[in-house]
Amino acid sequence: SEMKEHKLETYMKKENIIFIGMPAVGKSTVGVVVAKRLGKKFIDTDLLIQEQEKKLLREIIAEVGEDGFLKIENQVNRDVDVENAVISPGGSIVYCEEAMQHYKEIGTIVYLQASYQTIKQRIRNPKKRGVVLREGQTLKDLYDERCVLFEKYADIIVNEDQCEIGDTIENVLEELSRL
């Protein structure tokens, strides 16, 4: 509707949108399309980390461990200073409290939610997907641990079970227009 279009436009002028969720929910894919549709820039903060450190994520994790990586992830995301952007951080961003507080202040946090079944089907091989599991931790453990945090920080929750990526994008835009 016209009213909704207008609302999306005014709301989207300077506003940032931050996508959070498990690996394989399509944060980057959905993020890029939403950025195009709303005339925003798109930022993948994993790429910012690689740029800053001049190394691949897995090399950083291999060198400094998961805790060392989270320190870097927190710093890079906390220092993101933009307006009118769509930002897609890595899944472990929810462990970075300062970064998440920063995102709460500069934008709207959209949690792309999917059931464990959906995630498990999409992540056949966690290691290949760059999913870091601690000693003895299963993907289900990681899922349960992170979901609590995703829900805590989310301004909007969009569920994508049984959804094609196109549906998810429409649902995100629909939710944003309601704000």
What are the roles of these predicted feature ranges?
Residues 19:
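Hydrophobic anchor at the beta1->P-loop junction of P-loop NTPases
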Residues 45-93, 97-101:
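ATP-dependent small-molecule kinase phosphotransfer cores
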Residues 7-14, 33, 37, 147-179:
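NTP-dependent small-molecule kinase module
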Residues 28:
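Walker A/P-loop
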Residues 25:
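ATP-binding Walker
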